[in-house]
Amino acid sequence: MTTDTFHDLETFSPTPLKNGTHIYAEAAEVMLWAFCVEDGTIYVWDLVNNSLHWIDDLAECWVSRPLLEGVLPHELSEIIDDPEMLVWFQNGGMFDFVVLQRALPAVLDRIPMSRWRDTMVQAFAHSLPGSLDKLGEVLNLHEDKRKLKRGKALVQLFCKPRPDGGRATKDTHPVEWQEFIEYAGGDITTMREARRLMPSWNYKGKQIELWHRDLVVNYRGFAVDVELAQAAVRMAARVQAKLAEEVHTATDGD
């Protein structure tokens, strides 16, 4: 029996995302990795400061513990290495997988493609909005609009270079960094609730197999005969020049 786990990455790259995911990912860094198992405790792994954060149910506040640099928290490692754990991301197929290929390839290698799932793809498969905030509106997940606005501001602060070329960090913005951690945890709450409320009849079995196959093709790419392609470009240029000359002759230069 499989178990759903939910994940969200907060990343930084000096390259704007609008330039394309693969170009963005070439220099991307994973700063935070939020995750949970079904309705269990939500954890946020701070890779920049080597710590793990979660809400203490008794104290009703965020607590943390230090981690060794480069070592996954055992809570996440157990998920990654358990073949019965399905790994859900929001737009994970076209973003998080690509980023992990570059930033944490050794971790990605431990998660077979067959265990990947995507709440955005599930939403699109049922004619629902893909973005998490719009999906939340449709599913009546009454999110605090102020928190959403604040979260977007934190993403702007930490996930992009500053106008002067510098970078905001926990050292420069300690209060905002803690807010950023809590924001990452909040996205997990929305994602798992959306997964629970969405239909799944168009995102199971054969449909998921086809989605996995599509991802493999996208990641692998396809072979191109470069010499033939370049010859086609040259041929097109010659034909266009010939047609332009014919039009010029037929219209007496008009």
Question: What role is predicted for each listed range?
Answer:
Residues M1-E10, T15-L17, A27, L32-A34, ...:
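Conserved "right-hand" nucleotidyltransferase catalytic core of DNA-directed polymerases
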Residues P16-T21, V44-D46:
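Short, glycine/acidic-enriched capping/hinge loops at junctions between secondary-structure elements
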Residues Y24:
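Non-catalytic, usually N-terminal nucleic-acid engagement modules in DNA/RNA processing proteins
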Residues D39-S200, K206-W211:
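Active-site-proximal helix-loop-helix substrate-binding element of RNase H-like nuclease domains
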